[in-house]
Amino acid sequence: MATATLNFITFNQDHGCLAVGTSRGFRIYHTEPFSKIFSSEDGNVSIIEMLFSTSLVALILSPRHLIIQNTKRGSVICELTFPSAVLAVRLNRKRLAVVLEDEIYLYDIANMSLLFTIATSPNPSAICALSPSSENCFLAYPLPKPREDKDDKRPSHAPPLPTYIPPTSGDVLIFDAITLKAVNVIEAHRSPLSCIAINSEGTLLATASETGTIIRVFTVPKGQKLYQFRRGTYPSTIYSMSFNLSSTLLCVSSTSDTVHIFRLGGPNNGASGAAGAGSAGEVLAASPGQDITGSPRADRWSRSRSYDSGNESPGSGSEANDIAGSPSPRDRPTAANRRQSGSFSNILRRSSQIMGRSVAGVVGSYLPQTVTEMWEPARDFAFIKIPKSSAARQHNNPGATPSLPIAGEPLRSVVAMSSSSPQVMVVTSDGKFYVYNINMETGGEGYLVRQYSILENDDKHDSSSTYES
């Protein structure tokens, strides 16, 4: 019998379980110790999501059809059909969010009643995050961009144009899933978003744009920028971001073979201001006179700016400008400004290498925010090198999600931190599950301690463990 094709990989909300959707059903594993606790041959499962470690799972077996199933009882709780393909499912103990390309359906998970339908800009990558927390129950997604042109000149028989168009900037809308109101807009990046993640307590939001060089962390819902990290110099597509349960580390995987681990906060665990300059992560304080919570909108939500220059428009630069001062091809400054910016950034870079972090933090606190971010770019605290697969990776399932690799594409990965030890778990699109140890004192390169396959046909990973009631 041929090996099943891998369609979907996801960790549950506390990283204690791993759910895998394949062309021949789905499997659920414990992550510590690694063991298979449930398997089903329900058909071609393109999406699967768990509700913590309970027996409740959400399944997509056909593009527009969602099934909520109790795996312990082997029963279907409910079935829902949508007007277009379901691209993602998010859930916590109070809410279920179903993401379509241009809509998000929000349900009360207690009785599966529809609470709200959110119109969005075209979102083919299903960029959406729902807080695992029931208390801070926030939904984050790209801010819809209204269409500016009107239908006045269109023929009367022509279908109406969509209300929203694809985003051109990386603004994030924060939606309270309990009160069903939009509460803030975080202007996170100049270019469109590629990945967002919310921590377990629903208090932090990590964002990455299509450029993928800068990772930012904001408070939720106020939108204060706390950390800004540099993933790398060259553009890269971010596949996965995940906080550990204590929100002290952030893991990021991308098209490169490197998983980056960033440290959030120092001894004071992320206090803002100059005190954070000595930590591994760059803590960004508000500039004098800057309202860190954003000015409230009169109609629907407040808005928090997070671009490095308060008078720059969202589309006027790239991620490279945000931290290194380098011009983007679309928006190059004058030659004089380019020389001045480059020489000044070089001076700062050399100075920061000579002076200690404490001195840099003190001097940086007197500089404008843009210069402060140039002063001390925050790199990763630790990193992991994913082994290159020698097996050919083919995309044989036409109904599979875009998270799978096709021939010639780089290996894709999903990452999470262990809840009980300083270990990073990495699952790759060729069916490998890796566990790496991280030195929490010195950081540096993590080392591989365990490796498993999630596509094997044998039962050596079977376990008698059961779910929560």
Swiss-Prot record:
Keywords: Autophagy, Endosome, Membrane, Protein transport, Repeat, Transport, Vacuole, WD repeat. It comes from the Eukaryota. Residues 297-306 have a biased composition (Basic and acidic residues). It is found in: Preautophagosomal structure membrane; Vacuole membrane; Endosome membrane. It is a peripheral membrane protein. A motif (L/FRRG motif) lies at residues 229-233. SMART domains: WD40 (SM00320). Residues 307-319, 337-348 have a biased composition (Polar residues). Residues 285-348 are annotated as: Disordered. InterPro entries: PROPPIN (IPR048720), WD40/YVTN_repeat-like_dom_sf (IPR015943), WD40_repeat_dom_sf (IPR036322), WD40_rpt (IPR001680). GO terms for biological process: autophagy; protein transport. GO terms for cellular component: endosome membrane; phagophore assembly site membrane; vacuolar membrane. WD repeats lie at residues 188-228, 233-272. The PI(3,5)P2 regulatory complex regulates both the synthesis and turnover of phosphatidylinositol 3,5-bisphosphate (PtdIns(3,5)P2). Necessary for proper vacuole morphology. Plays an important role in osmotically-induced vacuole fragmentation. Required for cytoplasm to vacuole transport (Cvt) vesicle formation, pexophagy and starvation-induced autophagy. Involved in correct ATG9 trafficking to the pre-autophagosomal structure. Might also be involved in premeiotic DNA replication. Component of the PI(3,5)P2 regulatory complex. Belongs to the WD repeat PROPPIN family. The N-terminus might form a beta-propeller domain involved in specific binding to phosphatidylinositol 3,5-bisphosphate (PIP2), leading to the association of the protein to the membrane. The L/FRRG motif is essential for the cytoplasm to vacuole transport (Cvt) pathway, for the recruitment of ATG8 and ATG16 to the PAS in nutrient-rich medium, and for its recruitment to and dissociation from the PAS under starvation conditions. This is Autophagy-related protein 18. The gene is ATG18.
